[in-house]
Design a protein with these regions (language model features):
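Hydrophobic beta-strand-centered segment that forms part of the acyl-chain substrate-binding groove
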Residues: 64-94, 99
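A generic structural signal for short beta-strands and their flanking turns/coil linkers
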Residues: 19-21, 31-33, 52, 73-79, ...
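Hydrophobic residues in beta-strands and at strand termini
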Residues: 37-39, 83, 130
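Non-catalytic linker/capping segments at the edges of enzyme domains
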Residues: 1-36, 40, 139-163
Length: 163
C-alpha cells in the first residue's frame, strides 16, 4: 500500500454508497478525516432543504474514515447528530472529523459539518469499536472466547474475518 494511503482510503474505495452520493475523501490520517459532498436536487426533502439523512451520512462517512485511519477494522457503536441550520441544494458540505479519545478498542470522535464557507450545519459525535480478528480454529481459545458465537454464526460479518 502507498505510505500516504491509510486503511481508511482502502475502506472508502470500497464504499459504494458514499461514492455514489458524490462524497469525496479529502484526507484521512492519524485519527482525523475530511470529506466533502455537494447537495444535489435528489438530496432535498419536501421543505426544499437537504434531508437530514444525507447530512448524517456525510458526517458518518468522515467519522468512519477517521476511526479507520489507524488500521484495524473499526465500526460505529453509536452516533448522534445535532442539526444547527439547514443545507440547501447547491451547497457543498465539508465534514471534519477528529478523534477525541481512544481507550482499549473504543473511541470517541467529533465531526463538524459546515458549508464550504465555514457556516456550521451540524455537529456529530460517534462512538467506535475496533473489531478483533477471528481466532484461529487450531489454538486454545482465550479467556472469554468460549462465550462468543461460533464462526459463521450471529455477530460475524460474512467474509470479513472479524466480529
Amino acid at each position: 500500500m502507498d505510505p500516504q494511503r491509510t486503511a481508511a482510503h482502502e475502506m472508502f474505495d470500497a464504499d459504494v454508497a458514499s461514492n455514489r452520493l458524490g462524497i469525496e475523501l479529502v484526507s484521512a490520517a492519524n485519527g482525523s478525516a475530511v470529506a466533502r459532498m455537494p447537495i444535489t436536487e435528489g438530496m432535498v426533502n419536501g421543505h426544499r432543504i437537504a434531508h437530514g439523512g444525507f447530512v448524517f451520512l456525510l458526517a458518518d462517512t468522515a467519522f468512519a474514515l477517521a476511526c479507520n485511519s489507524h488500521g484495524p477494522a473499526t465500526v460505529a457503536a453509536g452516533a448522534d447528530i445535532t442539526f444547527v441550520r439547514p443545507a440547501r441544494q447547491g451547497d457543498v458540505l465539508i465534514a471534519r472529523a477528529s478523534e477525541r479519545t481512544r481507550y482499549g478498542r473504543s473511541g470517541i470522535y467529533d465531526v463538524t459539518v459546515s458549508r464550504e464557507g465555514g457556516e456550521v450545519i451540524a455537529e456529530f459525535r460517534g462512538q467506535s469499536r475496533t473489531l478483533r480478528p477471528l481466532s484461529a480454529p487450531d489454538r486454545e481459545p482465550e479467556p472469554g472466547e468460549r462465550d462468543r458465537a461460533p464462526a459463521g454464526g450471529p455477530g460475524r460479518s460474512p467474509g470479513t474475518g472479524y466480529r
